[in-house]
Amino acid sequence: STNSTNTGHWTKAGAMALKCKILQFAASPLFNDNQGFAGGSSEAERQLLVWYGGYRSDLWTRCLEACREFFNALNSNGFYELNQATGATPTQADYRYAYRMGYIELDSPEVLHSVRVHGYDSFGAGSYCWHSWSDNGRNSYTPTQEYVEMFPWSDGTPFNWDETEAEGRLDEMFLTGTFNDGEQLLSNIVFTRDPRLYESVIVNGLPGNLGWSSVSVGGDPYELWVGGSHAGSNSFNETMRYATGYENMKYYLGSSDYLRQNTQWVALRLSD
């Protein structure tokens, strides 16, 4: 168990979770395989600096045991839990809000360990804070197409570009809707992909406003095509923001939303 005075400090739950994470990496094919991840011929691989020189099934057993110990302790002691969407029939906006507040709020029961960058977000203070990451100079590390395609459809079906293209549905890869007479913005929007995509990546057509104190998704959509109002020529030139046609979304809230809120970087979450 823990309380607000322990946020940001190491707890037993955080230490146990870190052990699980380390053992998961150790057991993964990145380090644990019959051949080195980079082929096996590099100096680092020959000296066994970046892998074990072979496959060891016991590493997966140790990872499993550590995870069991963690969840047994969690079942006994409680406190940590996933942030849940509210309502009898949650909408995609509800799931997005639950996901967002699960990592961004300082007292979220999902957070097993977090670190501090700054006490609170004063926006224009010049401190190296979250808003500094969302300007043209700093936010040039954009998501890849491969990363975006990892997120499934909203019903859990894996996304497959070739199949979607063959079905003539590429224009539905992020959302669908209708244009009503006299309106310039899309109405009756249906988000077609896993809600976590829209909380991780800014995609074409995504409404620009997110809620902080309540569930809300609205505003003008992002125009990320070549010549669009947001991307401009960046995606064509593969430079600056939207260089890949996408942008990072996490910790990306408006100045009025995040103003004077406590800031943290989540190192370990229960969902991990």
Segments (PLM) and residue ranges:
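Long, amphipathic alpha-helical regulatory blocks in the mid-to-C-terminal portion
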Residues: 1, 63-66, 72, 251-252, ...
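An aromatic- and glycine-enriched ligand-binding surface/loop that stacks and positions planar moieties
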Residues: 12-13, 21-228
